[in-house]
């Protein structure tokens, strides 16, 4: 970053001579240093998977979750700072509740994503605030079918068939590009998400991690859920076996 230290990174509202907002770049760096997030929009729903890094063996299993419910038909996954992400999760739940109270129906996924994106963007306009150091994958099923959107610190909001964030973003993206999303079921996507996360995990730098999986599909009656233990264990076994086969 050519202008670091020259004053252009002191305020999020200040552009550098080459047209950058360095504090937004720094927020993106926080996302890049997070555990890998992978999301797949299948033909019958959406699957979220997160490589939750475990910095200490004293950490209780299931702590600091990165997959969360927003409404019955909406689930999200987080890459980046959890403290910042909690604010976005709270905001998303409030937006979903207010929309349903006003219009009498569940909020469309695209509308929710755009509202959170606008909230993020607001935090790039004023010197008295800073960008959120996290990106959020928003998924669900509405009247338009399965939906997957990524909302980034800059306030961008983009729909995807498959998406990745975090340390293994590029390697995961390369794997996602090989998938025919329109032919894949959620059960198959759970295995693929697990396989990709295990394949991009860096065992040298990050030895321990927990695999978090969430899904919403016709099989769950269009309700977002944490993947059941039986399916989770089956997917993890498949991922580990695939990794062993690849290393042979």
Curated annotation (Swiss-Prot):
InterPro entries: Ntn_hydrolases_N, Proteasome_alpha, Proteasome_alpha-type, Proteasome_asu_N, Proteasome_sua/b. GO terms for biological process: proteasomal protein catabolic process; proteasome-mediated ubiquitin-dependent protein catabolic process. PROSITE patterns: PROTEASOME_ALPHA_1, PROTEASOME_ALPHA_2. It is found in: Cytoplasm; Nucleus. GO terms for cellular component: cytoplasm; nucleus; proteasome core complex, alpha-subunit complex. It comes from the Eukaryota. The proteasome is a multicatalytic proteinase complex which is characterized by its ability to cleave peptides with Arg, Phe, Tyr, Leu, and Glu adjacent to the leaving group at neutral or slightly basic pH. The proteasome has an ATP-dependent proteolytic activity. The 26S proteasome consists of a 20S proteasome core and two 19S regulatory subunits. The 20S proteasome core is composed of 28 subunits that are arranged in four stacked rings, resulting in a barrel-shaped structure. The two end rings are each formed by seven alpha subunits, and the two central rings are each formed by seven beta subunits. The catalytic chamber with the active sites is on the inside of the barrel. This is Proteasome subunit alpha type-3. It comes from Dictyostelium discoideum.
């Amino acid at each position: 970053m050519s202008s670091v230290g020259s004053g252009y990174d002191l305020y999020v509202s200040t552009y550098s001579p080459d047209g950058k907002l360095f504090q937004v770049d720094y927020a993106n760096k926080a996302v890049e240093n997070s555990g890998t997030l992978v999301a797949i929009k299948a033909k019958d729903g959406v699957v979220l998977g997160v490589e939750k890094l475990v910095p200490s063996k004293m950490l209780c299993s299931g702590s600091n979750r990165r997959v969360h419910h927003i409404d019955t038909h909406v689930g999200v996954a987080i890459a980046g700072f959890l403290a910042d992400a909690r604010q976005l999760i709270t905001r998303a739940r409030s937006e979903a509740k207010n929309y349903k109270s006003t219009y009498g129906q569940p909020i469309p996924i695209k509308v929710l994503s755009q509202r959170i994106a606008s909230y993020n963007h607001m935090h790039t306009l004023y010197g008295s605030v800073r960008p959120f150091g996290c990106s959020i994958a928003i998924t669900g099923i509405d009247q338009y079918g399965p939906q997957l959107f990524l909302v980034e610190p800059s306030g961008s909001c983009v729909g995807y068939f498959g998406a990745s964030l975090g340390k293994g973003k590029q390697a995961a993206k390369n794997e996602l590009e090989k998938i025919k999303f329109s032919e894949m079921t959620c059960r198959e996507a759970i295995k693929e998400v697990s396989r990709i996360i295990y394949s991009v995990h860096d065992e040298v730098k990050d030895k321990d991690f927990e695999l978090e999986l969430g899904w919403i599909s016709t099989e769950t009656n269009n309700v977002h859920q944490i993947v059941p233990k039986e399916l989770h264990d089956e997917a993890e076994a498949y991922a580990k076996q695939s990794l062993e086969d690849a290393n042979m």
